[in-house]
Amino acid sequence: MQRALLALAAGLVLLLFAVLPASAQMPGQIIVAPPPESADQKETALESSFRERLVEPGRLRITGDLAKKLEGLPAFLRDTNFTFKPRTYYFDQVDPSGKTEEAWALGGSLEYKSGLAWDRLWVGAEFFGSWPLNTGPNAGDTLLLTSQGTSYTVLGQAYVAANLSETNQVIAGDFTSVDTPYASRQFNRMTPNAFQGALLNGFTSDEQHRLHYLVGYLGKIKERNATDFVPMSQAAGSSASTGTAIGAARYTRGEFAVGLAEYYTAQVMNIAYLAAAYTPKLAAPYELKLSAQFTDERSLAGASGTPLPNQLGIEAVGSRDFAVLTLSFTQTSSAGNLSSPWSDAPSYTRAEIHDTSRAGENAALGMLSYHFNRFGLPGVSVAAVGAYYWDAVTTTSNPQPNQTEVDLYLDYKIPNGSLEGLWFRVERNWEWSAGGGQTTQWRAIIYWEIPLI
């Protein structure tokens, strides 16, 4: 605990000395974020896939006399944005064998976006880096640094994007703006996953019966602490050099939503994902959201279409006055462990340590979170997660005991003022195996997004 608190305190000092004052801060757009304030804010994996725009062009953020002087410039130059995103992360894990993985890193990114050219086209880039502040045993295994526990820098984004119409957008190049169920930025370390390819994103204009769609091809992935892009097939463990064709759609009608996503990687595997959600309107202050999902995986190596595991999941989320309760259940078939080579699996019962679904496994998870807005502490929240995993396929040579996990979170994300969006998190995680032994973790994170121009 002492090391975690030192990481937070020292990281804050470093951040405050490293940044320039800004009149307004942008909220941190990060996958692992503070818990939702209500049930309807709890995004499913398919919901997070679809936004009206995958990326946005630069917008004029300068005010006053300087803004007037820039009026004569083309929008491509005038609306240029630079955003500094400092980040510090402390990670400490001890597994049942006594192996320790510990590191404290400082880094972040500098993002560039141009304004619009011809009212449609713009470019963007983002440079990432992570440097060690402290390296404990097996620092490279924490994924905060390179596999050798050293610093790294990488150009993670370099793309061109265009608004084809008010409802359609295309992006091509290297980008991190992918948040689909089985391919996502997975931004839970210092640097997110980045993908190389092209995507078309769009939606119908009817808000009452809206269809969102996403199609494209992802040829390569740069994983979180890597500096090179590799074929999607190789990230999935194959020696082939193929990419992944992706197609996804989500239809929303009032309180109901249903969708699917398909991932086809030639010579490797096919993943099909289906999901549905129902958000009924209840009398205030109560809210409810019911969701279901199904994953089917098939191997394309050797016998085409050979079944891999499938998983069925259900989830109920209820809330009242900033208190949110989540109850989830999943069941994985006995064909094998659920595979998710390009992101965290979208399983409802995935926790911090137990982040895979084993063959034959049943899992139940409960989470209770609370935001302290009513007590004059906006931005402060706590969450507790408890999960139990049982009946995984076990053999004499590969025992798979039942497991229990508990995760505790404390978050503070400054809601307004000159430090708006500055986010602090401390978490403590435990996993116990029925056969004996436990894994423990401390994590401490500080993150901010600071518009420079």
Language-model region placement:
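N-terminal periplasmic/intermembrane-space "pro-region" immediately following the signal or transit peptide
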Residues: 2-107, 111-118, 324
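Outer-membrane beta-barrel channels and translocator barrels
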Residues: 77, 116-119, 165-167, 204-209, ...
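Residues that define the transmembrane beta-barrel architecture of outer-membrane proteins
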Residues: 78, 102-106, 152-156, 192-196, ...
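Transmembrane beta-strand segments that form the barrel wall of outer-membrane beta-barrel proteins
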Residues: 84-90, 170-178, 182-185, 213-215, ...
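Sequence/structural signature of outer-membrane beta-barrel proteins
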Residues: 89-95, 130-135, 175-186, 220-224, ...
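Outer membrane beta-barrel
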Residues: 112-230, 249-256, 326-335
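Outer-membrane beta-barrel translocator/channel fold
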Residues: 209-240, 285-363, 426-444
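Outer-membrane beta-barrel "beta-signal"
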Residues: 247, 366, 408-412, 438-453
